Amino acid sequence: MTQAAPETLPLPPSSTEAIQRFCDALWLEDGLARNTLDAYRRDLTLYAQWLAGRGKALDQTEDVDLSDYFAARHEDSLASTANRRRTVFKRFFQWALREHLVSADPTRLLSTAKQPPRVPKTLSEAQVEALIAAPDVDAPLGLRDRAMIELMYASGLRVSEIVALKTVEVGLNEGVVRVIGGKGGKDRLVPFGAEAGDWLRRYLRDGRTALLGERTADALFVTARGDGMTRQAFWYLIKRYAQRADIHAPLSPHTLRHAFATHLLNHGADLRVVQMLLGHADISTTQIYTHVARERLRTLHAQHHPRG
């Protein structure tokens, strides 16, 4: 005999409406992905249901309610999960304050839970080479994809930066790209190597012109319709080529950026140089990659040292 699920208290209409309006605003203003919006809605709904047990709606939240809620959820939450909820609640109540749904922000005293630094997943150099070689360069789209992957691995650009690149921002003769308005609104110059430069030239000569036909575009990397690439499209390509290259390692949209940083450090690059290339404001962000490099060195030592 199965046990009945505990009864869930119905949400006050004002809470349901506020959550929906907030998610609509995020979709319109920030263009957040559906999965992200669903996670935000789920976190807020769970809290609103818990709060309904106290006879309150979301707009009646007080500091003590949030403190009690996080204390109640502490035992079943990772620090990263708790921090995500804090971020969601802060955004929601800051929005609610702007919309005059609340008179004060009850999240102002919420502290961040400590969590260990997340070591980014990366690929070996052999795996990157296999990924780079996966596109069919006899086709215009394959040329585009090869040039994109070459450039990302050669420069460490963020996905959002590489899809936003304009043709005029690439200096082929100088071997640099100019990133306009990167993370934090900062511009920077990032070098790339001769191999990436050769593939960019080939793409511009044979691939981009074939994709555009009689059309014109500012974007460096274009689709078959002549539009600029999107982050989602690039991520789809990386997953497809990883499958073609028989790569089963965990991937993310920034896999090549992580590989760029880790492989530079493995080959003795200075941490400050890598920080500048990645566009990190704080070197502690870059230091995460040293954990990957150290683990790789330990593995090599264990495999190849006679007393490993």
Curated annotation (Swiss-Prot):
GO terms for cellular component: cytoplasm. Residues 118-302 form the Tyr recombinase domain. GO terms for biological process: cell division; chromosome segregation; DNA transposition. The active site is at R158, K183, H254, R257, H280, Y289 (o-(3'-phospho-dna)-tyrosine intermediate). Keywords: Cell cycle, Cell division, Chromosome partition, Cytoplasm, DNA integration, DNA recombination, DNA-binding. GO terms for molecular function: DNA binding; tyrosine-based site-specific recombinase activity. Residues 13-97 form the Core-binding (CB) domain. Its main location: cytoplasm. It is found in: Cytoplasm. InterPro entries: CB (IPR044068), DNA_brk_join_enz (IPR011010), Integrase-like_cat_sf (IPR013762), Integrase_catalytic (IPR002104), Integrase_recombinase_N (IPR010998), Integrase_SAM-like_N (IPR004107), Recomb_XerD (IPR011932), Tyrosine_recombinase_XerC/XerD (IPR023009). Belongs to the 'phage' integrase family. XerD subfamily. HAMAP family: Recomb_XerC_XerD, Recomb_XerD. Forms a cyclic heterotetrameric complex composed of two molecules of XerC and two molecules of XerD. Site-specific tyrosine recombinase, which acts by catalyzing the cutting and rejoining of the recombining DNA molecules. The XerC-XerD complex is essential to convert dimers of the bacterial chromosome into monomers to permit their segregation at cell division. It also contributes to the segregational stability of plasmids. This is Tyrosine recombinase XerD. It comes from Ralstonia nicotianae (strain ATCC BAA-1114 / GMI1000). The lineage of its organism: Bacteria, Pseudomonadati, Pseudomonadota, Betaproteobacteria, Burkholderiales.
